From Swiss-Prot:
Gene source species: Dictyostelium discoideum
GO biological process per UniProt: nucleosome assembly
Comp. bias (Polar residues): 317-343, 929-944, 1123-1133, 1182-1191
Basic residues bias spans: 383-394
Protein name (Swiss-Prot/TrEMBL): Uncharacterized protein DDB_G0290301
Taxonomic lineage of the native organism: Eukaryota, Amoebozoa, Evosea, Eumycetozoa, Dictyostelia
Amino acid sequence: MSSKRRNKNNKNNNKNNNKNNDNNNNIEQQDDIEDISSGDIDTTNLIIDEIEDVYDDYDNEQIKNSLNHSFSNKNNTSLNNSINLSMSLIEVEETELDISSTIRPWELNIFGSLGSSGGGISSTPISQLSPFKTPSPPSSSSSSSQSPLRKPRPSFLDSFRSQFNITNINNKNNNNNNNTTSNFNTSNILNTSNFRNTNIGINNSANNNRNISRNSLPVTFSQITPIKPKNNKQIDSQSQIKPQSQSQSQSQTQSQIQEVQFSQSESQSQTQTQSQNEEKIGFRLPSPLSPIKNIESEQKKASTTSMSYESIEKSQELQNQTQINKSKQDLTNISQKINITTSQHDKDDLGEYRMSEKGGGDDGDDDDDYDNQDEKDNNYNKTNKKQQQQHHHKGKEESQSEYYEKEKEKEKEDIATTRATTTTKSTDNSNNNINKNKEFNENDLQPWLLDALLTQTAPDYPIIQIIKHYDRKEDINMDGIRRKEYQDGSSFLVSDGVNFMIAILPTSVARDLIVSEGTRKIYHEMVGFIIEVQRYVLFPNSKYSGFELFIGNAKFIDKTNEPINFHNLKGVISSSTKLKEVIKRMSHENYWTASSPTEYSNKFFPQNVSNSHHYQITQHETIISQDQLDSLNNLSDWEKHEQPNKLYQFNIYKTNFRHKNKLKQQQQQQEQQEKENQQQQQQKQQQQQQEEQLKEQQEEQQQNQQEEEKQQPSQRQSQQNQQSQQNQQSQQNQQSQQTQQVSQKHQHSQGSQQNQQSQLLQKHQQSQGSQQRQQSQEKQQSQEKQQSQEKQQSQEKHQSQEKHQSQQSQEKQQSQKKQQSQQSQASQQKYQQSQGSQEKQQSQEKQQQQQQQISSQQKGLPKINDDEEYDDTILESFENYSQSQSDLSQQFLSQSQSQSQSQSQRQSKKRKEREENQDSENLDDTVDMNYNQIPSTLDHSTLQGHKFSMYDNTSYYSNQEQEEREIERRRRELAGEDSDEEFEILDEDQVGIGLTHDNDNDNDDEENSYTPTGAATISFLDQNIISGNSGVDESKIPKVFNKNNFDTIKEEEDDEEEKEQQNNNNNINSNSKNNNVNNKLNSQEYDDTFKDTAWIPKKSGKDKFDQSSSSTNFYSSNKKNVPQPTKSVNKPRSTALKKGASQNRQKQSEQQQQQPQQQPQLPQQQQQQQQQQQLRQQQNENTISSLNASRPITKSAPLKYIKRDLTFEEIVKRNKLIRKSREEKMEMWKQHNNIIDD
């Protein structure tokens, strides 16, 4: 074979080149032996003795089958990749490799890493590599030379020559030491691979990992030793196991050790120069012609004649035999401990990597595979040892003598002894790292967590036990602790024997504990650790829902199989209610920490948070005395629960309610904003859709136009004819609509004429009533004269006649009410019928309008704009309101009729009683109503809450006129007529007595309201309240602007002018009316109620009388008779009233003397009529007096009704209403046009 020939040529060249250096090599060998026997060498190079071709019987197919067999149960992509790397790097030319099923993934990764530049191993010195740091990856420049074609086989051996020391042991010794393993340091090889265990068998590596160099020397990789740093402080002198024979041979082998060191330095320099040259060239150089040991062996062969060398060998043989026998026994005991040290180094190297990923994990499945592989290795070694022996003997016969073999065996035995001493040192170091306390008891674990949190004091050097590895998904973000301390840390559950809580261990602390105990796994094997805590901090978590413990430094004590008192453990906070109250008070602005030592928490938290001085509070200091409680209760802030000062803003008892309310408000605002945004988006979408539709319509129109242009002229003429016909039809339709509109207008005009006629009738009736009143007044004056003379005679007659007349009047009233009710029902039916006909007409008109609009849009005709038709569409809603109002009026009328009958009977009884008590001569207490004669002696304090005006019924009308006006008002209400034509409601600014609020302030508060003690007169509204009728002010109800109202606005203005003329005519006789007031105020009850009321206005600026607010037409004719307020003079009220009464008597007597002279004597028939009228007047006076007596005192005073014109303010109001109606019409019309346009 070609490889054998090459190896033989290389051997011959080595022999010729190295004859001159025999003497030097002998000295170096002696130094090597001394160094090896002493065991003080730290690092040794690989010594390659022999390489033989042992791989002739194996093929590539067997290699693949063995690989598939060994890794059939694993589906790991990284492992398959490593296999491919190893196959690419191991070149097979003529000889075939046999990689059996015992190959492990880390071994393949080793080969893959060796393929890099410089032998594949990092060039950093081993002394600088710490056991807890992985070396840096290879440089990018070196990766360019990793092609397998440019990597001959010798480079693999050269790389081992620079880093490892591989020696041979005889097959006999190897058979006894199948189970021994070497301590393999993987810190030099961890470039890209992640693996756990690197135990390589002494004999397994010789059979599994085989490579062929150019020289055909057989090699067996018996042992691979770890390279240790020079300064190894962990090795103790007591733990080193040295044989007895070793101490004797130290003095003899010192010279030999020096020679070995010198040879080693030369070999290292050679390998370094070779690797540098390889990097420069870009591919691997061939290996040296012969290894170092071959040179030495050939030099020894030439110097066999010297006796000094033979004497040294004999002494070494005797010493080594004794050492080997003892070392064999020690190796078997130590082999088990070697695994522990290798696992420690692995975990030291991989600890940071695993903690940074997920805080540790379980890799227990790999251990079973490793054990199965060890059994396969042992079985395979037995079969391959025979092959090694055969090839070894062939090499002896061909190239070496028996003497040379003996020398090599002795040297290798010496190296084995040195290996045994180094392994014992490493195992002793591992035992020293396990700081177990055999005297530890379970009673030593005492509870301390709860007391420390409640007292805020941390004890020194407490003991805890790890219960569980607490995998928190969320980040550990605590207040105060720096990220460097906890970002790579992990959390555990820790107990003190009674309570448990969360503890945070940095990676450095957890790694030290794992190394000290010697476990093979990272975090999950820490369950059961008993630790003495040396530095720690107790603090609240980021959510302030519990406490946590940060451990800065700890010491391993012991480990138990199960946690102590595991089933009875409780959480710290759940075990005590006091601690719950403490954590509730904590927040980001208020918290505290406790640490041991006390200054240790200042590293993470501010000083004001930690109790570094150990201040403690006693029970006496927490007691509050009664004096202090009283002083606190007396404070306004304490009682009112006001906010404290800014200094105490962040106190302990502050709650987060405000913060929650703010959050709710923010959420609500966000929701509103989202809704608004959604609405805006919807509007935008609608607008876009509309725009798209318009665009489509425009496009369609354009297309239609284009099509029309393309049409023939004949078709165009036909279309024009059709359009002309359509135009004619539309004109006919318009004419028909115009005729309908004219008819509708005619109907409207007829309806307005009917309304005018009804109003004229009402006015005629009113004028007749006014004439009758004038006649009745003249008759009254004549009758009063006769009554003064014939009272005594006529009293008895009057009483009898009054009874008959009262019955007749009641019958007449009932008949009138029936007639009025029938008339009202008939008018309502007519009104409903007219409305129904109008609605039908409106619906027909709408349909016609729609048809016209459609035709106008199609033909491009002008739009129709009819004001009258539009008015009909607007007023439909108002008509519905008027119908509801008419229903309400019917209900009120039915109630008033039922109640008036019951009350009329009661009033008739009261009249009889009061007529007996009447005295016509008691005129002393009468009071004139003119303000000029009212005394000004009343105090201003009695006038608070009252308002006065110069418009009062009593000042201008007699009681008889008031009664007649009220009766007419009732009749008109029952008949459904408008009561606002003759009687107008005064505004609240003009009403005199008993209003509840001022003009400026419209607030109806109870403080500003005033209830009068009495009333001088009773209005019609009060009588309705007493009689059961509705107290609703129909004038205050908003007027419905029906179609008739719009048409009759101008007619109402004409009616107002007629009213003004009537008022002027009626006000001519005002003087005579005022003179007759005293004759009508004869009852004592009326006088009593009149005295209690105040009649003088206030002197404030609000209540001054302005003539501008009065009716202008009335005072234009009677400016002389306008009453004016007099200045107040301090006089007693009683004397002033008497003087006023005496003056009134004098005026009445003078008027009575003048009247009979002017009036002629009337016939008897007229006298009878006058007597009947007087009786009626007396009855009316009796009813008023009875009502005054039974009138309840109400908070809201009555409104006064007087005969007058519209004031300026009322005119403004009516104009505003008209403007509003017009504006509404315009808005509706705009909307109507927009709808048509769309």
